[in-house]
Amino acid sequence: MITEKLQNAINEQITAEMWSSNLYLAMSFYMEKEGYCGMASWLKKQSFEEHAHACELASYIIKRGGKAKLDKVDVVPNDFGTPLEVFEQVYEHECRVSKMIDALVDVAAAEKDKASQDFLWGFVREQVELSLIHI
């Protein structure tokens, strides 16, 4: 059984992942409009990955006997500047997401939930692997 504190923290991450998905999709639309179809395609792929993360987190909560929920997802911007500015925003956003995931691992550790720590470490590893791949 997952603790309420950890369940709430993961539910917040689900909402954050959905916001990230919407952000990358909006960036994709913007880049396509500007004529950068390759960048648009890559950003759309990132959007789908963030959506998949949200679903994976929700499934995990449910498997642990908890209640997954999606809170209101804030509106994302629709104008992003130059292609360089777009990718600077992507980088800054991914740094914030990495910190959020690290904080989730810390909550799982504080709750002495080793199964959740193991599950969440998969997201930590993915962030590191993606960083190394894109360098």
Residue ranges and their predicted role:
Residues 133-135:
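Conserved small/polar residues in nucleotide/adenosyl-binding loops
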Residues 32, 36, 72-79, 99-126:
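Acidic interhelical loop/turn segments
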Residues 10, 43, 87-90, 101, ...:
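Hydrophobic packing residues in well-ordered alpha-helices of helical domains and bundles
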Residues 31-72:
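Conserved alpha-helical segments that form or flank metal/cofactor-binding pockets of metalloenzymes
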Residues 9-13, 18-25, 98-105:
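A structural feature that tracks compact, well-ordered secondary-structure segments
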Residues 12-15, 19, 45-52, 89-96, ...:
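DHp/HisKA dimerization-phosphoacceptor four-helix bundle of two-component histidine kinases
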Residues 2-7, 72-92:
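Acidic/His metal-coordination segments adjacent to aromatic residues that form catalytic metal sites
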